[in-house]
Each structure stands twice: as C-alpha cells, then as structure tokens.
Amino acid sequence: MRSLSGKMHEVIICEKPKSSEKIAGALFPDAMKKKHGKVSYWEHVEGDKRVTIVSAVGHLYSLRPRQSNEEHFFDLEWAPIHEIDKKKGYVKDYLNVIRKFAAGADRYIHACDYDIEGTLIGFNALKYGCGEEALRKTSRMKFSTLTREEIQRAYKNPIEVDYGQVDSGAARHILDFIFGVNISRSLMKSVKAATNRFIKLSAGRVQTPTLAILVEREKEIRDFKPVPYWIIRAELGEGIIAESKRGKIFKRELVDSILEKCQGSDAEVKDVRVRDTIRKPPVPFDLGTLQSEAYRVFGFSPKKTQTIAQNLYTEGYTSYPRTSSQKLPESIGYEKILKNLAKNPRFGVHIERLRGPLKPHEGKKEDDAHPAIHPTGLLPSELSKDEKKVYDLIVHRFISVFGEDAILQTMKVELEIGEEEFSFSRKRVSKAGWMESYPYTKMEDEEFPEISGGDSLAVRSVSADERETKPPARYNEASLIRELERRGLGTKSTRADIIAKLYDRKYIEGKKIRVSPLGENIIDTLTRYCEKIISEELTRQFERELEDIMRGKISKDRVIDEAITEVRSILSDIEENLRDIGKELYRAYQDSRVVGECPACGGKLVIKYSPRNRSTFVGCSSYPDCRTVYSLPRGASVLKSLCEKCGLPMISYGRPRQRACLDPKCGKKKSEVEEVVGKCPECGSDLIKRSGRYGEFVGCKGFPKCRFTCSVDEVPEG
C-alpha cells in the first residue's frame, strides 16, 4: 500500500540520535535534516521512494503495573517511559516524532544496535509507536561498526528480526521488575510495620547476590587471623638475593637453626639453568577484558570504560563494545584497518613491524552477534583525554594480536649454603615480538650474572625476613566483574550497572571495595529470614533460561511464571517475619546514618531528612533534649575523616568536589582543607586529595583545564 503522496514510504528506526545521523549520512549523503520541536530526523526522496530516518533515545517504553493499587505487582504493561519517570520528559519528543512521521509506512527497517537491548528498544518503538501492523513490515539491519561501508552492506542485505532476542530482552526486564520492585517494596513495608518509619531500600535479582559475595569477602577479611612466618634470605655479591627453598617457615626454632647452620659458609652453585619461554600475543578484547585492562592501566571504573567504548563506537572509531567475543573474523578486513591506522605515525611504527600473513591470536570466547572489540580504521579527529586513552588501548591491543610471539629468558640458579638449599632467578626479554606494540605490558630486563655450576660465591649475610599471612584481597570493580562472570551472574552489559547501583545505594564504598554496615546488615537479615533472595543458583538458573528463550528452547511465559512462583515464595517468607525483619533493617539503617559524636551532649550525630525542606541535615540523636544541628549543602557527602581543628566530620560537596568541616563556623577554610600530595605528571600543578562517589581520590588542582586523576595509592613520584 502506497502512502498518500504516491511514493513508497520506508522508515529506518535507530537507537540513538548520533546513530541516526551516522546511518542517514552513510546511506543518503544528501538526505535533508529536519526538525520537529527539539528532535531531528532525516528525509530522503529518490524516484518513487521516500525514506524517513528517525531515532529513539534508548528505551522509549518501560514496565509499570496495570493496577497500581495492588499489594504485589505481577501484571505488568509497557508504557511510555516519560509517563513513568518524570526525569525522562525529553523522551516524549522523540516518541512524538516516531508517531507523527513513522506510523503508517510501507516498510520499516530496524537499525538499532544488534543485541538484546537494542532489538527490544526498536521492537517496542515499532509496536507501540507505530502499531502492531508495522512489525509485519519490518526487516533488520545487522552491523558491528558504524562505518559507511558496513552500514551500506547491512542496508542492502537486511535480515529478519530475531524474536528470540525480543522475548529474552522482554523477559529480563519483567524478571528484574517482579524481583526488584516487589521485594524492595516488601522490605520497606517491613520497616514501616515495625517502626512506622519509611526508609528507601533496594533489592534485586542480581544486585542482592552480588552484595552477598562482597559481604562474604568482608567477613573473610575481618575474621582472618594473621599468622607470622619467616623467609630466609641470603645476600650475595652483585646485588643477588637468594631465598631458602623451604619457602614460608612457621617455626621460629627452625629459623634459628638454619641461620646458625649457614653462619660463615660460602654459597656453592649447584645448578644453573637458562630456558626460553614463549609468551603468545594477547587475545582481542571482549567487553570484560577491556574493562579489566582499562582499570589496571588507567584506574577507570568498568562503567566509565563501557560508556567511553560506547561513545567511540557511536562515533564510528571502534566496533560494538558489548560483546563476549574474543574472535576477529577475516571479514572485518584486517589489512584495510591496519593500512588506515598506519596513517597515524604513532600506530604506523608498530604496524610496520608486522610480518607474514595476518593471523590474529584469538581467545576461546565467542559471540554470535558481534566480533571482538576492534578499531574500524577511521582515525579520530578529536577525542577527550580519557577517550584517547581507551581508543589507544584498543588500537594497540588490535595491532599486538597480529604480532610475533615474545620470548622471555629465565635464569634459575640453585645454591647450597651450609647444607641449606637456596635459589634465585632472573628474567629478561630476548625477543620483544608483540610486546613492542603493546606498551601497557611490563618488559622485564634483569641482568644475568656470569655464574656456572661449581662456582663458590661469598655470602655477605643470611637473615630471616619476618612476615604475616594476609587475608583474601578486597575486590575492586574489575575483579568483581570477573568474579560475576565466573559465577554466571548478570550479563556483559549489566554487570557494571549493578556495581554502580550498589555504590549509589551506599551499600559499598571505596575503590578497594568495602561493604558498609548497612549493606552487611541487609545481607545478614535476609540470610536469616529469606535466604532465597541471595541465592546465586536461583539467579544462575534464570540467566540460563533467559539464554534458552533467545535460542528458542523455552517460552518466555514459562520463565515468567516460574519467576512469579519464586517471588511469591520469597514474599511469603518476608511476610511471616515482617516485624523482625523491619526492626533489624531499621536498626542497620540507623547505624549507617551515624557520622560522629555530638560535641554538645556526647550523643550521636545522625544524618536526617527534613520532609518540609526536602533536604538532608546532621542532627543529634538526643533531640529534642539536644538541638545541635548542621545543615548539609545539596549533594554533600559526610566523610570518615575528621576536621583537624574541631574534630567534627569533614564533608565533600560541589563540582568539582571540595572538602570542608561539617560546622561552617569552624573557620577551617577550603584552602586549609586541601591536602597536597604531589605534583601532576601532566601539567605540573599540585595534586590534591579529593572526595567523590567512590571515596577519596587524587586530582589535579588545575581542574577543569587538566583532568588528571588517580587513586590515593597511586600518586606519581617526583
């Protein structure tokens, strides 16, 4: 059926405005950019065909209960997101453009990102924005980069919409809603029943088991009892330090016996072995390994890395980031990408070293939808400092996977001192290979001493180095993402958001993650009364079933029915212990609000909320007997550090974050509060200890002109 103009009307729907601009420019360079209100769209007319390119802005629709007055919400519907979340009012303008200019077309092309979320975004926009009829006229573009060539190829070779992706995506949203919303409401109801107070609490299908993992580690660290041990070390000539082959020695008497036995003896060289070890090139980045590497190299949070990688993809500089693949198929065009990258001398010097046929060293992980993360060959014209860091990391990784093996040489020397066996080793790179193209790896280059079997070496001293066993290491964001992946919790796209939510809820804090008392008490309470909420196995089961929905092995409705049954069981457990749960949660919440001691009466200073003023403040727990009160600036955080002048807690506030005393009358000026910890390696200004969402960090005083930051533990020397 033709439109009223007599021309066949085709609509291309994209996920985001920037993507729609890229796709319009690649397919129809002379397309006319138009505006309806604040929203842009594109039109192209050629012969008897009219094409309209419109954009979503992420999800246009979200879930809500059909009846908002029910006790529990299991009957849900999709509704425009701006009707549910008032902060999303801007979405209405995009939806209006789709309804006005896309409805009633002859043909639709779904051109959102090719993943579960992208497929669901486009499906809902078409179904609810253009009507059910639109779905029968829809085909799908599949692309992994927003380059002109790939967009044109995807347009000329459309595929069918993957309804397995649609159902899996919809089921995930429904499961997250019925778990998260119902259980969170039930927990808040328990507090209301026990104390007649309202506090905001949050639980989630993946969020709560993740918090439980962190609580388990917190308890392991707290319960750990360090045990002393000794390492016997011998100092020889030429800066050589050899260690006893006994390793850790836990008995002091044995240590004394060994030291006495070694006294006055030379070191006899028993064996010298030099061997070569091949170190293969790294594998291409999937999202998880990119996040881990960016955290290791730059200290970037996984969420920050994911956001930057998405921006680089949208600009057309790198491929789609939310991939599990460590494979680089030949079809991406290795030679063309490398040839274009070589136009930048910084990359060209490394590309020139590549020898022989181009064959990437690939990893085991695969993804049906997208290849590993790689540069497209399009050189950026302008990037922010952090975008440049991530882009360079991706490019160097891509080049290095085609590199030659590196060869590491290891020297192992075994010695005997007074009949006690010692050894030492040295390492050096004999062939750099791929390591020359990947500057983020450490190239060891230790000097090998000229020693042969039978030599006798003078011993300068033999001593015992006393140490203690250490507790398990705290998770950081990168290691937690790896742990969640190992345990099968969450997805590549959601894990960073889950961790960010735990920070936002104040359940965890710090780069080396610590669980707050509130976070720990929530898990302890849930473990006692309704352990199923924190069950990893239940979460894994639903992750497997969501995957099975996508592959057509199980129906969406069956999985949703299973989830409703499980949630009803959890809600029943909470209801049976409603007041006990509420009392414990409220006690934990109250403890988490204590920030110090009242200087007037010795009571507790507590963070409070004023409904009348809609603001938080710090007041004494002994109110009304004690009326000590301190206002808090909007968005302020109370820190653990204390004011050197009056002993009250410090606060951080403003953009960029400033630190000051809780008491504005203290007289502690901002300039006095700033703690200089070094010099910025990029601009030479002072480095200042600051406070932010993840706790304390170090930033350049030259902000915003210089945006250098690092953790408190990584302050550059000099």
Swiss-Prot record:
Q: Which residues does UniProt mark as catalytic? A: 320
SMART domains tied to this protein: TOP1Ac, TOP1Bc, TOPRIM
Q: Which cofactor does it need?
A: Mg(2+)
Every copy of the Topo IA-type catalytic domain together lies at: 162-571
Site label Interaction with DNA, positions:
59, 172, 176, 322, 505
Give the boundaries of each C4-type zinc finger: 598-626, 680-706
Region Interaction with DNA: list its residue ranges. Answer: 202-207
User: What HAMAP family does the database record attribute to this sequence?
Assistant: Topoisom_1_prok
Give the residue ranges for region: Disordered: 361-380
Q: What is this protein called?
A: DNA topoisomerase 1
Binding annotation for Mg(2+): 15, 113
Coiled-coil region(s) at which residues? none
Known partners and oligomeric status: Monomer.
